[in-house]
Structures are given as structure tokens and as C-alpha cells.
């Protein structure tokens, strides 16, 4: 059985809610800038790859199963299931390889940018 709370014993806060508290000038803009900077931005290319591979993981193994059970193995579902499993694993492996290549490309671009910044700083020091 649930116990009843006595509301008089509970502590009551007297501070106004955060949205009604007085703000300093510029505080709101600073918070908005932080929130916008912290939003995750995913490149459209990455999202399209994810969508395409998701559809491929659903469609290709099922297609491989039904094609192989009807036309290749003449009703043997064991081999057809193995074919579907191999197809799904190949798609997953190819997605991992593509993701690793993309990540290496991003790391190389970051190194190049750092080198360019270093070269610019050196030229500024020389002047």
C-alpha cells in the first residue's frame, strides 16, 4: 500500500523557474551560440550511405534467399538460408570498409588543415 506524503513537511523552493529568472544582457545569445555549436551535424553523404546500406541489408538477403531456394537449390532451405546469411555479412563487411575509408579520409584532411595552419603561422613569424 502506498504511503501518503505530508505536503507541509516537504521543502518548498521559492526561486522562480529558470525561464522566468532575470537574465544578464548577452546571456541568451551566448547560450544560443553554445547550443548551435554543440548540435551534431552529419554530412548528407553519410546519411545517404546509411540509408542505402540499411535498405540493402533488408532487401538483398531476402532476395538472395528466395532466388536461391526457388532457382538454385530447388527447395533446399538450408543452403538458401546460408546464402542469405553470407549476403548479409558481405553487406555488413562492405559498410565497415566504406566507413573506415571515409574516416581515414577525414583524418587526412584534418592533418592537411593543421599543416596549412602551421605553414601560415610560420610565414607570419618570418614577416
Swiss-Prot record:
By its UniProt entry, which Pfam families does this protein fall under? VMA21
Q: Subcellular localization, per the record? A: Endoplasmic reticulum membrane; Endoplasmic reticulum-Golgi intermediate compartment membrane; Cytoplasmic vesicle, COPII-coated vesicle membrane
Q: Which stretches are Cytoplasmic in the membrane topology?
A: 1-45, 101-127
Tell me which parts of the chain lie in the Lumenal compartment. 67-79
Q: Where is this region: Disordered?
A: 1-28, 107-127
Which GO terms of type biological process are on file? vacuolar proton-transporting V-type ATPase complex assembly
Any one GO CC term of this protein is: ER to Golgi transport vesicle membrane
Its placement in the membrane is given as: Multi-pass membrane protein
Coiled-coil residue windows: none
Q: Origin, by domain of life?
A: Eukaryota
Give start-end ranges for motif Prevents secretion from ER.
124-127
Q: Which residues cross the membrane?
A: 46-66, 80-100
Going by the UniProt record, its keywords in alphabetical order are: Cytoplasmic vesicle, Endoplasmic reticulum, Membrane, Transmembrane, Transmembrane helix
Is this entry keyworded Endoplasmic reticulum?
A: yes
Please indicate if the UniProt record lists Endoplasmic reticulum as a keyword. Answer: yes
Main function: Required for the assembly of the V0 complex of the vacuolar ATPase (V-ATPase) in the endoplasmic reticulum.
Q: Which family does it belong to?
A: Belongs to the VMA21 family.
Q: What is the official name of this protein in its record?
A: Vacuolar ATPase assembly integral membrane protein VMA21
Organism of provenance: Coccidioides immitis (strain RS) (Valley fever fungus)
Its gene name is VMA21
Amino acid at each position: 500500500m502506498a504511503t501518503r506524503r505530508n505536503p507541509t513537511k516537504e521543502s518548498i523552493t521559492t526561486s522562480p523557474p529558470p525561464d522566468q529568472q532575470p537574465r544578464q544582457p548577452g546571456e541568451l545569445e551566448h547560450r544560443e551560440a553554445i547550443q548551435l555549436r554543440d548540435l551534431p551535424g552529419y554530412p548528407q553523404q553519410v546519411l545517404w550511405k546509411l540509408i542505402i546500406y540499411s535498405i540493402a541489408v533488408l532487401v538483398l538477403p531476402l532476395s538472395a534467399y528466395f532466388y536461391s531456394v526457388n532457382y538454385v537449390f530447388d527447395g533446399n532451405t538450408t543452403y538458401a538460408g546460408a546464402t542469405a546469411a553470407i549476403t548479409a555479412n558481405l553487406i555488413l563487411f562492405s559498410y565497415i570498409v566504406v566507413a573506415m575509408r571515409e574516416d581515414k579520409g577525414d583524418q587526412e584532411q584534418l592533418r592537411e588543415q593543421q599543416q596549412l595552419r602551421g605553414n601560415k603561422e610560420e610565414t607570419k613569424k618570418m614577416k
